[in-house]
Structure formats: C-alpha cells, structure tokens
Regions:
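Beta-rich strand-turn-strand
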Residues: 106-109, 156-169, 174-178
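C-terminal segments of enzyme domains that contribute to small-molecule binding surfaces
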Residues: 139-161, 189-202
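Domain-scale signature associated with acetyltransferase and cell-envelope carbohydrate enzymes
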Residues: 1-126, 147-148, 166, 182, ...
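ABC-type ATPase nucleotide-binding domain
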Residues: 122, 153, 171
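Conserved active-site beta-strand element of glycosyltransferases/polysaccharide synthases
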Residues: 186
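Short beta-strand-loop-alpha-helix junction that forms the active-site gateway
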Residues: 131
Length: 202
C-alpha cells in the first residue's frame, strides 16, 4: 500500500494541475516526487500516468517531471518505477502507450518521442530526440518512435531520429543511432543487427 503522505500528494497534485489534465486519467506518484508543469502544458490522460510505481515508498529515489510551455503528454496507461527523470521542453510532445519503464530512466523531449503499447523497458534507459547542443553550427533534433511490443535491455540509450520497429529487442548496454527493423535483435555501440525474425514473450 502507498503511504498516507503519498496518497495525500496524489490528491493534491491532481487538484493542483486539474486545468492541465484532460481525460479521465490521474497522475500517480510518491511523497518525494517533484513536478514542475507550466500552466500552458497539457496532459491528455486516457489512462493513468504512474511517475513512481513504488507503492511502499521505501526506495528513497524520487521521480521528476518537468513540462515547459505548450508541451504535451498523451498517455494511455503508463508506469515508471522510481527515479524517473522526464523533461519536456517548449512545444514538445511525449506519447506514452500502455507500457512499463523500469527505474532510473531519463527522457529528454525537444520535439516528439513516442513509446508504443506492450513495451518492456529495463532500468537506466535513456532516450533523447535532440543533440541538445550545437555542433559545427547545427543542432540535430528529430523524432524518436519506439513501436509496440519492444523489449529494451538495461542501460540502453536511444538517440534522435531513431525508429524502433514493432517486436524488436535491443540488447543491454546498446547505443542506438539508426533505425531498428521490426522483429530484429540489435546490440552494441553503435547498435547493429544480430538476428532477424525474432519473437519474444514476457
């Protein structure tokens, strides 16, 4: 069961950001979690968004959600474990399907990041759709799309412009810089094809 402090924070948070929230879903979190949501940001919640799914609140690691001006989250029913660090910059959009993301993840959304349904994503995962800084006079910002039923191992990083096809598997420790074909296994730095026509089950 969640602690009383966490339950109180859930109620207060959903009341405080009621003008930002559209739909029937709610924000779930623990007592130490930190939210900074601009008044023009929008959370379109068809289902619940669990920022910290540690119901006992014993891990001591808070989750952070920052949404800058005119940013949007569209969510079906998505769960983070503890230690989530999610930032949406101005005018960006994060689309979350019915999936699960383990502890200590980082999401940096400058433009568009999509995570589909039925994904299982391990701990220490990072995804970013921008280089964040200029290099040789340019700043690369391109959408990232993670399809449905994707298995992502621990300590994987996915960089801007990548599309991960449905049913794909990404091995632990990989850095993904190019598209991943559906139902393929990739791994390495940078990630390369290891096997095609793979099938996996939870």
């Amino acid at each position: 069961m969640r602690t009383l402090k966490s339950l109180v924070k859930i109620i207060c948070t959903n009341v405080r950001y009621r003008n930002n929230i559209q739909g029937r879903g709610k924000i779930g979190l623990c007592s130490g979690d930190c939210l900074k949501i601009d008044r023009t940001a929008k959370l379109a919640l068809k289902g619940n968004l669990h920022l910290n799914n540690d119901k006992d609140g014993n891990n001591g690691r808070s989750s952070i959600l920052r949404m800058d001006a005119n940013s949007t989250i569209e969510c079906q029913n998505f769960s983070f474990t503890y230690g989530a660090d999610v930032i949406l910059f101005k005018n960006s959009k994060l689309v979350l399907g019915n999936s699960y993301l383990n502890s200590n993840c980082k999401i940096r959304c400058h433009n568009l990041i999509t995570i589909g349904d039925g994904c299982v994503i391990s701990h220490d995962f990072t995804v970013m759709d921008s280089d964040a800084h200029e290099l040789d006079g340019s700043r690369n910002t391109n959408p990232v799309h993670i399809g449905n039923h994707v298995w992502i191992g621990t300590r994987v990083t996915i960089l801007n412009g990548v599309t991960v096809g449905d049913g794909a598997v990404i091995a632990a420790g990989s850095v993904v810089t190019k598209d991943v074909a559906p139902n393929s296994l990739v791994g390495g730095v940078p990630a390369k094809m290891i096997k095609s026509k793979v099938e996996w089950k939870v």
